[in-house]
UniProtKB/Swiss-Prot annotation:
Protein name listed in UniProt: Diacylglycerol kinase 1
Family: Belongs to the eukaryotic diacylglycerol kinase family.
Tissues expressing the protein: Highly expressed in roots.
Originating organism: Oryza sativa subsp. japonica (Rice)
Enzyme class: transferase
Keyword DNA damage on entry: no
GO biological process per UniProt: defense response; glycerolipid metabolic process; intracellular signal transduction; phospholipase C-activating G protein-coupled receptor signaling pathway
Record-level GO cellular component terms: membrane
Length: 499
């Protein structure tokens, strides 16, 4: 990048020559910097956000490497600076420079790509920030897997294993970012409303002291159009999934344990092992003898769906054994498993189901009975209990059904108290808009606009042995599953991802 060879004028840290395709000059990043002459804009300018608390020590190491290879001013530690402030400052500067006739600013803004390294919650945080900016041409986002589940990176071909942090690995990743294709995905709006209680708390309880722990789900102000007198209203958004029930409870316990003992969570393998142990402890592999109502979705809430835009609300019957319900937008949950799968031809005809796309305005609703049910996903054509595809879904909580429930949005769990004397607690999910991701090969997500995506469902007849959607068949199957002396998990299966 000719024209900014001085360190004060935005040079990349050495060695920088091979990476001029990505480096952004200081005067673009910092409005107070002196403008310098730049002959040519980088062809793939990137701004990098890294959660230094993710991946044990990997986050901090990754920051160091990116700052060695790029302009330090374009690499941000999310524990030190919020992305909304960074991007607001950057885009305000873009507009100022473009109004002054700067062609470099125009080219960099047009070609800008964002990189976010962290867990699914971190990636969702950045997606929310970009959505909130409401830009006419929002920058597409690439995700570096640096968490426990890494569902978002896996969905778009970036893998699910935590990366190495040496310079060659980072250079290779940047090369993939440059070649990656853009893919739109649906954004989902979530609103929760409850009557203001006479006594007792009803605020969502955040298990993590991170700046974004409940960024995607916060209480609306009194002036917000969604606010209603006498009610507490919360709003947020998600891109991968919303879940409620036992899986969210296990996730909550994991995050709480990590907060209490951070020194025990230094690598991905340890984290996954701890996750599996907590699942066993919480009864996710074996239902409690007392069958508490908080673990049975049907006893907890009535569920209604609207199948298509402008359609009618209709009640969705939930089998009594379902202890976890997942509203899924992407084909990756619990570390890369696909709970929806691809419905067979008979299912399509009988139940009006379609192949899952990430940009079709529909969300897949899947139920799980317990973690053993999750093991079905490992079988060919295996899937959870397909409940519905919907444009909107509403949970109406029964009065006094439970003191609390557990919820999770894109990897961020919380314990949600419920007022005992209120039968008006409602959670509603609806399609909002779309954001743009960067996809690399092999990409699990499918777009309705991609000619290579299957526009119809598979020819298999949906192997009922794997779905076990009949209650009696499930009970009999559960007694037998895993009972043989020769039964064992395949070597490549990580049991931590089955929760």
């Amino acid at each position: 990048m000719d024209g900014h060879t001085n360190g004060t004028n935005g040079s990349c840290s050495k060695p920088c020559e091979p990476l001029t395709d990505y480096c952004i000059p200081d005067y673009i990043l910092n409005p107070d910097s002196e403008q310098v002459l730049v002959d040519q804009a980088p062809c793939c300018p990137v701004v990098v956000f890294i959660n230094s608390r993710s991946g044990g020590q990997l986050g901090s190491s990754l920051i160091k490497t990116y700052r060695e290879l790029l302009n330090k001013a374009q690499v941000f530690d999310l524990s030190e600076e919020a992305p909304e402030k960074v991007l607001h400052r950057l885009y305000c500067n873009f507009e100022k420079l473009k109004s002054n006739g700067d062609p470099i600013a125009f080219q960099i803004q047009s070609n800008l790509r964002l990189i976010v390294a962290g867990g699914d919650g971190t990636a969702s945080w950045l997606l929310g920030v970009v959505s909130d900016l409401k830009l006419s041409h929002p920058p597409p986002i690439a995700t570096v897997p640096l968490g426990t589940g890494n569902n978002l990176p896996f969905s778009f071909g970036w893998g699910k294993k935590n990366p190495t942090t040496d310079q060659e690995a980072v250079k290779s990743f940047l090369g993939q970012v440059k070649k990656a294709r853009e893919m739109n995905i649906d954004s989902w709006h979530i609103i929760m409303r409850m009557r203001a209680p006479q006594e007792g708390p009803c605020e969502p309880i955040a298990p993590l002291e991170l700046p974004h722990s409940l960024h995607a789900f916060h209480r609306v102000s009194g002036s917000d159009s969604l606010n209603m007198e006498g009610y507490h209203t919360y709003r947020g958004g998600f891109w991968n999934y919303f879940s409620m029930g036992m899986d969210a409870q296990v996730s909550y316990e994991f995050h709480s344990e990590r907060k209490r003992n951070p020194e025990k969570f230094k690598n991905q393998l340890t984290n996954q092992s701890t996750y599996a142990k907590l699942g066993l402890k919480q009864g996710w592999f074996a239902a409690s003898l007392t069958h508490p109502s908080s673990r049975n979705i049907a006893q907890l809430a009535k569920v209604r769906i609207m199948k298509r835009p402008g359609g009618q609300w209709e009640e969705l019957k939930i089998p009594r054994s379902i202890r976890s319900i997942v509203c899924l937008n992407l084909p990756s949950f619990s570390g890369g498993l696909n709970p929806w799968g691809t419905p067979g031809t008979r299912k399509v005809q009988d139940r009006d189901l379609t192949a899952p796309f990430v940009d079709d305005g529909l969300i897949e609703v899947v139920g799980f009975r317990d973690a053993w049910h999750g093991l079905v996903l490992l079988a060919p054509n295996g899937h959870g209990t397909r409940l519905a595809q919907a444009h909107r879904i509403r949970f109406e909580f029964h009065k006094g059904a439970a003191e609390h429930t557990f919820m999770r949005i894109d990897g961020e769990p919380w314990k949600q108290p419920l007022p005992k004397d209120d039968d008006t607690v409602v959670v509603e999910i609806s399609h909002l808009r779309q954001v743009t991701m960067l996809a690399s090969d092999p990409c699990k997500s499918k777009s309705v606009n991609d000619p290579s995506s299957p526009m119809c469902c598979s020819n298999h007849d949906d192997d009922e042995r794997n779905s076990l959607e009949d209650e009696d068949e499930w009970e009999e199957g559960r007694k037998k599953f895993g009972a043989a002396d020769t039964f064992k998990f395949p070597d490549e299966v990580d049991v931590a991802h089955l929760s």
